């Protein structure tokens, strides 16, 4: 993944938008390069369509395969090293020890879900056998288990650039259960988000997962030709669930 400031619809960079924005260092007000293009309604629709198609394949992936996938995401995030930490520091103003700890938490979450997938009990499988001779009516055979819902939209949080953002708990849990993810990156730490997205894309390629199992879009709130990108994403017919961490007003706006 080249950091060109575009959306990433699968492995394909898409730069249809005309509006651009950039992160700003909150400590000194410096505008940080590069410029990033805002997504368009059409790009969001395409991402939803591709995620829906990917779901039909990804939902059938075994627990062991998904565990390997999550483990590789964690490893690729770690391989980003100090470049990731330094950029996050510039974009958020958070101290490096705090950022380093949060990266460790994020990597740990991914590995935790990988271990859970290998163990397997998360599906809560239940088998209630039939009793054909039960009176007054026979009892049917009833079996159940947890299954994936479909594509999930995840919104990055401003104050947790790793643990509640691109590869945070919402993304990790969705990918673990078999749901493709479309991340709406937080504009305050957009390049940090894009770097983490590149780690996920590398893991997808390494594992030969469907390329549209993860997609990454971005925009500044309320600037998408007066259409809120978040609402466009949430209202897309492909989206089955939403992971959001943020203000009450922001959450209510998406819910309503």
Range-by-range predicted roles:
Residues 122-256:
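Rossmann-like NAD(P) dinucleotide-binding subdomain of oxidoreductase/dehydrogenase enzymes
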Residues 1-137, 206:
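N-terminal Rossmann-like NAD(P)+-binding subdomain of aldehyde/semialdehyde dehydrogenases
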């Amino acid at each position: 993944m080249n950091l060109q400031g575009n959306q990433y619809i699968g492995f394909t960079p898409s730069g249809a938008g005309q509006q651009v924005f950039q992160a700003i260092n909150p400590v000194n007000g410096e505008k940080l390069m590069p410029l990033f293009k805002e997504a368009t309604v059409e790009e969001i629709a395409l991402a939803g369509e591709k995620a829906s198609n990917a779901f039909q394949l990804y939902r059938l992936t075994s627990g062991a395969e998904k565990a390997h996938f999550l483990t590789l995401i964690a490893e690729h995030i770690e391989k980003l090293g100090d470049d990731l930490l330094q950029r996050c520091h510039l974009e958020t103003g958070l101290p490096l020890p705090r950022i380093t700890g949060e990266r460790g938490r994020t990597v740990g979450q991914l590995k935790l879900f990988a271990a859970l997938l290998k163990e397997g009990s998360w599906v809560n499988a239940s088998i209630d056998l039939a009793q054909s001779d039960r009176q007054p009516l026979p009892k049917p055979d009833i079996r159940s288990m947890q299954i994936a819902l479909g594509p999930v939209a995840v919104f990055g949080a401003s104050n947790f650039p790793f643990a509640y953002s691109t590869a945070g708990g919402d993304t990790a849990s969705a990918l673990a259960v078999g749901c493709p993810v479309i991340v709406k990156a937080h504009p305050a730490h957009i390049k940090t988000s894009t770097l983490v997205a590149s780690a996920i894309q590398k893991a997808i390629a390494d594992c030969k997962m469907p390329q549209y199992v993860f997609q990454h879009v971005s925009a500044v709130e309320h600037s998408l030709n007066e259409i809120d990108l978040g609402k466009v994403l949430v209202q897309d017919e492909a989206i089955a669930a939403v992971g959001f961490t943020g203000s009450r007003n922001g959450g209510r706006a998406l819910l309503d």
